Amino acid sequence: MAEFGRNKKSNGKKFTKEYKVKAIQQNITRKARLKKEYLKALKEEGYAVPEKETSRREVNVKKLKEDKRLEGKKKIDEKKELKKQRKREQREKLEERRRKEEEKVKIIRQKEQEREQKRRKMTKRTRSGQPLMAPKIEDLLSKIKNDDTYTL
């Protein structure tokens, strides 16, 4: 079949990204070369060569890019700060919870020790096996002293 005017060499490569990139680069280099030659010709003929001036647009673009970069950095810093603050709060909550648990355990152990001491005191016996009454009387007396109904 006939190729209908298509060059076998290009083989449809005109529509690829690589071809377009290469064409753009060639166009840019050609324009730069022409501009350079034009400025050189102006200089040789004695005309004033226009100086490169940074246009307001370029300055504005640079400023906008810088502002965007700073804004993005600021947002990132704020996010990092929020993240740090959340972690710090979680750590503080965890430490508080742990401290409360330790305190509860400490109080429970202390109460158990007091009960054990009281039990030992109350179960003391004489050599002949009779229970001692002094610890029991002291316990009753301390209960009466601690009770609000008996105090004036």
From Swiss-Prot:
Coiled-coil segments on the chain, per record: 71-122
Region (Disordered): 66-152
Biological-process GO terms, alphabetical: maturation of SSU-rRNA from tricistronic rRNA transcript (SSU-rRNA, 5.8S rRNA, LSU-rRNA)
Highest taxon above the source species: Eukaryota
UniProt subcellular location: Nucleus, Nucleolus
Keywords assigned: Coiled coil, Nucleus, rRNA processing
Bias type Basic residues, positions: 118-127
InterPro entries listed in its UniProt record: Fyv7/TAP26 (IPR013730), Fyv7_fungi (IPR017265)
Biased composition regions of type Basic and acidic residues, renumbered to the chain: 66-81, 89-117, 136-152
Family: Belongs to the FYV7 family.
Protein name: rRNA-processing protein FYV7
Organism in which the protein naturally occurs: Candida glabrata (strain ATCC 2001 / BCRC 20586 / JCM 3761 / NBRC 0622 / NRRL Y-65 / CBS 138) (Yeast)
Biological classification of the source: Eukaryota, Fungi, Dikarya, Ascomycota, Saccharomycotina
